């Protein structure tokens, strides 16, 4: 069967919002080079290629327009939304394998639609970025030290695909950020992390607003990022920066407003001994169109 290509908006229930992803079904016959060419042609921040797997229900590979990445939150939501729709799934648990490992995905059938919940990887944190590197990140984002929440480190956090966490004061106009992309690319090469996630907490709410810049891997700005909002939740627990009941923390991560692509990632962090133990992200999706690949490689 020829590969089937879907254009999906993830982390939204409305078309033309959220984060668009390519989803390619029946990708088993495609080579690495062909997958990269397709991802480059589709020009989504990530395209997910679904393949058969002997150890899971499905294997997924993820490509930006320029490089393969371990995993991608919004493309995972998009991929399982398409798969559930095509197969007519009900409420079920699916296991997927990717370069980031083996993860559980929950398919929730609701109101003749689906909500997808992805269990992310174990939260991890690198030492805070300090001194010249910290200053360079702040400068590259066209911010000042006064824009950063006092006592909040600038730090790489990961639940599978690492991002740099930068917590801004609530009065910073996050939509007005205009980073120096060349500088961010150079910093990425220095620190070994390609995503920068400045965000802020809405006062008195378990809600955040963020933006994610990743020019080093061909993504100027990602509209709505599961692999940023998930580790963000873990990072907030790790540093005691958002109140919780000691068992779970639930956050609505808002993103994409500056691009006119608003979307929401529902983040749940399970907690043990006041530290993050497990992270899930959840969201909706919309299929805009699908097509069959017409050419033969």
From Swiss-Prot:
Check the record and name the Gene3D superfamilies matching this protein. Answer: Diaminopimelate Epimerase, Chain A, domain 1
A cellular component annotation (GO) from this entry = cytoplasm
Gene Ontology biological process terms in this record: biosynthetic process
Highest taxon of source: Bacteria
E.C. no: 5.1.-.-
A Pfam family found in this protein is PhzC-PhzF
Binding partners and assembly? Homodimer and homotetramer.
- Member of which family? Belongs to the PhzF family.
Q: What is this protein called?
A: Uncharacterized isomerase YddE
Instruction: Specify the species.
Output: Salmonella typhimurium (strain LT2 / SGSC1412 / ATCC 700720)
Gene name of this polypeptide: yddE
